[in-house]
C-alpha cells in the first residue's frame, strides 16, 4: 500500500447515494460557471493520440503512457493521453477560434505510474481548457486576472454546495493570494516544496504559486513541468488548505503557454531539443499556432474537496490495492 492518511474519527457527510447525486450537481454547476467566466466552448476530446504527433503530455518526462497498436493503422503507436495540454492549442487553430475565445473538454486519462494515496489515482478526470490571447497579453497580469476568474468559479461552487447541503461548512477565503515560487522558497528556506505549500495555504487558505518548472536560487525546482507547453515564468498551481488533511491540496495547474522563444529555451534546458522536429513543435516554431493560456482543473479533486471526502476513491471509480481497500473500509472511507 502506498501512502494513505486516515483522518481521525472520519465520518462522511454524505451517504454513497447522496455522494453520487452531489457529484453530478457539483460538476454541472462548476462546468457551466467556468465556461461562462472564461468564454469557453465545450469540444469533444480524444482519449488517445499517435505518439509521433508530439501531442501527448510528457508530464515530468519519466511517466510511461499506456500504449497499444491497432489493427486498422498498424504503423501508429497509440498512446492514452496524460493530458490535453498541447492538443487544445492545436484544436483552437483547427477550429478557427478567435482572440478572447476558448475551449474546454471533459478529459479522461490514465497515468499508470502514479503513486496511489488519498488524492492520487491512475484515473485522471479534469476539465482541460485553453483560450486565445495576444502576444502582448503574455504577462503576469493576464495570468492573475484569469486565476481570479477561475477562483470566482470555485467560490460560487462552494456557495452552491453549501446551499444544497447546509451541514457542509464554507472554508474558502474571500480572495486568492499570489506568491512566486522564489518568494515561497525565501519565506520558508528550510522546508520542502510540499511543506512550503502547506505552510502558505494554512496562512492564507487559497494560494496561487507563480513560476513552476525552472530552477530556484537554491538550484532546486519547486516542481517539474514539461518544457513544451507552459512558460515556466508565467504558470502556476492553484492550491487550497484542506483542514481534513491539515495540508495544501492542488486543484488546478495552469499557465500562459510557450511562445517560439521560450519553447526553444526550455527544450534546451530540459535537454530534449529533438522534440523540435515533431509536428506540433514545428507548427509552433513556424508561428502557425495561436498564443494561449490554459490549464487543467481536477474534477475528482474538486468533488473530494467540496464534499469533504477523505479519499479520491470516494468520488471516482478506480483501481486500488487490497490493503488500501481494507484500511479504508475499516475507517468509514467507502470507495466507489
Curated annotation (Swiss-Prot):
Its main location: cytoplasm. PANTHER family: ASPARTATE--AMMONIA LIGASE. Pathway: Amino-acid biosynthesis; L-asparagine biosynthesis; L-asparagine from L-aspartate (ammonia route): step 1/1. The gene is asnA. It is found in: Cytoplasm. This is Aspartate--ammonia ligase. It comes from Clostridium perfringens (strain SM101 / Type A). NCBIfam families: asnA. Gene3D superfamilies: Bira Bifunctional Protein, Domain 2.
